Amino acid sequence: MNSRGLILTLGVVIAVAFAQQDSEVEREMMKRKSAYMRFGRSDGGNPMEMEKRKSAYMRFGKRSSGGDEQELVGGDDIDMEKRKSAYMRFGKRSGPQEDDMPMEKRKSAYMRFGKRSSDMEVIGNEGVDGDAHDLFKRKSAYMRFGKRSMGEEEDHDMMKRKSAYMRFGR
C-alpha cells in the first residue's frame, strides 16, 4: 500500500509538472504568434492592423496587381511615387523614368554608392562649383575606408584619413 501511495503521489506530481510545462509552452507560443501576426501573415484580426501590415509590405516588398491595388486614395498615390523614386535612386531604372532625373544626379548617386569613374574626368566635367566639394567628400570617404590613389599632400586631415585607412584597410 505504501508503494501504491508513492506511485500515486509521483503520478500526481508528474501530471502537475506536465500541466505547468504545457501552460508555459502555450504562453510562449502565444507570444511568438503575436509577434508573427504583427510582422507576417495573420488569421484575420483587426482590419486596421492588417492595412498597416499590407502597407509596410507594399513599401518594402513585392506588390501584386490584385483588386486591393484598385483602392488607392490620394495619400497612397503619393506613397507610390515615393516608393518609385526610391527604387529609381537605388535600384534598376527603365525606359521613360530615366529621363525624369538629370544625368548628373544619377551619376553622382551612382558614384556615391557604387563604382567611380576616373576622378580627373569628373573634375573636368564639374568645374569649380558646389559639386566639386561633393566630389571631395566622396573621395575622402572612399580614401578613409578603401584604397588610396593620386598623390595628395600630407596634412593633419590626411593623417587622420591615413590612420583610419590603416585601421580598416589592408
UniProtKB/Swiss-Prot annotation:
Residues 150-170 are annotated as: Disordered. It comes from the Eukaryota. The modification Phenylalanine amide is found at F39, F60, F90, F113, F145, F168. It comes from Caenorhabditis elegans. Each flp gene is expressed in a distinct set of neurons. Flp-6 is expressed in the ASE sensory neurons, AFD, ASG, PVT and I1 neurons. It is found in: Secreted. PANTHER family: FMRFAMIDE-LIKE NEUROPEPTIDES 6, FMRFAMIDE-RELATED PEPTIDES. The keyword Mitochondrion does not apply. Residues 1-19 form the signal peptide. GO terms for biological process: determination of adult lifespan; germ-line stem cell population maintenance; neuropeptide signaling pathway; response to heat. The modification Pyrrolidone carboxylic acid is found at Q20. This is FMRFamide-like neuropeptides 6. Belongs to the FARP (FMRFamide related peptide) family. The gene is flp-6. One of its GO terms (molecular function) is receptor ligand activity. One of its GO terms (cellular component) is extracellular region. The keyword Phosphoprotein does not apply. FMRFamides and FMRFamide-like peptides are neuropeptides. KSAYMRF-amide has an excitatory effect on dissected pharyngeal myogenic muscle system.
